[in-house]
Each structure stands twice: as C-alpha cells, then as structure tokens.
C-alpha cells in the first residue's frame, strides 16, 4: 500500500501541473496590428495571457498612436505616418464634443459624413504609408510570424496578412454596416436581426422592419465611402483585384467581444467565437483613496459615473443639470470628469480624473452605474451585477443601451433632451426598484455560467490557428458561390423554366387535341346533314 501511495504522488503532481500550468506545445510568434483607443485596450488581457504562455508578440502601430505605447509583455514596432498625435487626439475629442451639439437631423448627417470622410482619409494615408514602407514590410516578411491577431475595423491589417500569407484571427466587437456577417457568409435576415444604429429590438413592428431594411441599404452607401478606397489600395499593393469582402473573409477565426446575454439571438457561423466579458474577469484591490470614499458613503453606498475617455468636457448648462440631479440622491457619486467643475456640484459628488471602473463596480457597496453604454462598461456592469442609467452618445452605444433596457437591466436617457429631473428619477428607479437589480443579477448569472472563461477561449483559438496554420475546415462553401448561386436563383430559374416548358407543351398538346376533336365533330355533323338531305 505504501509503495502504491508513493508511486501515485508523481502522477497526481503531474496531473496538477497539466491542469494548472500553462502548457504550450509550440511557442509561436504573433504579429498584432491593433486599432487605437478602446479597441486596443480591449486586447491587452489576451496579449498578456499569450505572452505568459510563452509566445512572442510584436505590436505594429503608427508613431502617432494615442494609447499604443511600449509594454512589458510585447515588442512595439512603429512606422511613420503623415499626421501627428495631436491630429488623432483632435479626432477623438471632436467626436465627444459633437455629441452635445443640438443640431437638426440634416445638419447631423452632413457633419457626420464630413467627419467620417476626413478621418477616413487620415487613416487611409497611414495605411498607405505602412504598405509602401518597403524596409518595414521586408522586415516583417523575414520575421516568420505564425499568425496575425488584429482588429479589422480598419481593413489595412488584412492587406498585410495577405501580403505575408499569414493565417489571421480577428478580435472585435462589431463592424460597421454588418460587414462581419457579409464576410463570414452568415445569414442576416432583416426580419428579426436589427441593423447597427437602428436602436431596434429583435421584435420589430412592420414599420420598424421597413426602417431596418432602409437602414441596411443606406449604410451600404456610407461604408462604400469609408472602405472602397482600401479595396483600391489593396488591389494596387497585392497586384490583383481585391474587394473589402475578400480581405475580411480571409480570416480563419473571428473572436467577437459579445455574447447572447447582451445581444439578441441570431444565426452564427462555425468560425465565429464569442468572448464577451473578456475584460472584466480580474479585479484589483482598491487604493486607499477610493476605499476611503466608499467607507465614507455609509449604508447608502456609491454610484459610479463615467462617459468614457472621449468626453472630456460637457457644456456648462448640461453639466450643471447633471450635477443638480446627482446632489438629490443620498449615495456618494464618483464622477470621472476632466472638464470644468460645475458651480453647483453637491458635497456627495466627487470629481476624479480617472477611476478603476471594473474594481469599483465589483464592490458590494456600488448601487448604480451611470454610463455611455460602451461595450466595455456594459459588460463590466453585467459581470458585476450593477444596474445602469445609460446615456448613449454615438456609434453602437445606442444599440447597447436598447439591448440592456429591453432586458430590464437599466434605464436609457437622451443626453441632449434629458432634464435634471429625468436623471434624478432614473437613478432613483434603478437604485430603489429591485427589478433592475434582479434582472442584471440574472444576466450576470447567465453570463458567468459557461464551461470556459472568455480569456481562455480567446487564447485557445489563437493557438489553434497557430498550430493548424488556419482553420479551413470551418470555412463554409458559401464563400465559393456567386451571389445568384448562394440564393439558388439559377436553380429557381431552371425549375421555373422546366415548369413553364411543361406547361407550354401541355397547353399546346391540349390545344392540338381540342382542335382535332372539334374538327372531327364538325366532319361528323357535316356527313350527317348530307345523309338526311
């Protein structure tokens, strides 16, 4: 018995090491081309985990990046671009400022179109400088990367991937105009899948379905303005005719920072993997400063307030209306705000330039979260079970807010039209009405009830693509069909032609028989008449 016990110890130890330790069969080399801003920040957890598992990571970014800097767990390579960091910052800041301008619908459309065109031209010039940097491209080709991990929001990185013949893993939340579903050949029916920026739920009225279809058609025009220049650039650089859909459909695996707890159920494809909540797994201890704020709040607890990094300043009148509402609740409010301090700011409201959002939301004394409904904040709220007051500002935030409101996890306010009383009532509702807390806790329970953590799942698929040089077995044959073959229009046309041909022949035969029969009767009658006479 003793011998068996001693012999079993190494076996148990080995099993524990296999389960607990990072086992990597092959330490690979990963080329990462991110998109600046929150897109980049969302990738950091996965990058760090991949580095801890022994992989070498090279991050390629323009030298004018705002957020992409040197890091301890990756090597940063930069390339020169024809714009400065200040230009990028101005683009981010202006986006936040434009939100609070109370323009007419037509003015907003014109301003949005001009801004998109201006920003797109700047980003396209950066892509062109990267592709035509012969020394850098040669260096990348010689580096023998195993895989590219990238956010395809800008389709420059897929061009690089095709040039280097690298299998690619896309890491994203969503693409404009539902391009991700076109690129994966995923069914995307208008009838129950709301289009981006529609603010519809998956249960639409007839008129909403009409609007949903019209939005899809109009977005195609907008996306053509943004993305068609990349197709031209790619065709010139790769020396073959390439469309944006060709570039995007080359991905081996798509890692989506979403799941069906937040989003509505819809069709998916085999190479679409969902890793929603990847950024809210780990919490750090709060600093003494924030612990002191929470302890001083007493039994009422705290409210966390952040509208994201793009909103640095709110118009004075609106800021005062917000401050007035915050002063009318008993909770302590931690407001991340770098603008001018409102003159009527109450004693219960503390302005901070930065706050550990996920760590604060995870504290049991947090009662509510005032947010712009960005995907990061929404998932942190779901993970930690904190009901929301949502003030969506732009982009997919409107859709995120609609989804959470539909699920009973928060209240949505129009930031331009809301009054101080509206905000006060919304806060009191989500704090005092138990249904909001119960609903967000139910979503949190559903979100956490899974066999694999999102971060581990993302890392697995990156390594999977590295090991197998892609994932062609997950690629549907729909990619190889023409549009009329995909919709079986040729088959329908053929069957229709057969039916019409058979119908025509049948008609002709019947007509011929009828004429023959009629002619025979006529001759019989004629013969009968001649006999009687």
From Swiss-Prot:
Effect of residue 395 to V: In CN1; has no residual bilirubin glucuronidation activity
Extra remark beyond the main annotation: UGT1A1 isoform is part of the UGT1A complex locus which displays alternative use of promoters, first exons and terminal exons. The locus is defined by 13 first exons, which are alternatively spliced to 3 other common exons and 2 alternative terminal exons 5. From the 27 possible mRNA isoforms, 9 produce functionally active polypeptides (UGT1A1, 1A3, 1A4, 1A5, 1A6, 1A7, 1A8, 1A9 and 1A10) called isoforms 1 (i1). Use of an alternative exon 5 (5b) as terminal exon is leading to 9 additional alternatively spliced products termed isoforms i2 and which lack transferase activity.
Stated consequence of mutating residue 377 to V: In CN1 and CN2
UniProt record similarity statement: Belongs to the UDP-glycosyltransferase family.
Species whose genome carries this gene: Homo sapiens (Human)
Effect of substituting residue 402 to T: In CN1; has no residual bilirubin glucuronidation activity; N-glycosylation does take place at this new additional site
Keywords: Cytoplasm, Disease variant, Endoplasmic reticulum, Glycoprotein, Glycosyltransferase, Lipid metabolism, Membrane, Signal, Transferase, Transmembrane, Transmembrane helix
Protein's UniProt name: UDP-glucuronosyltransferase 1A1
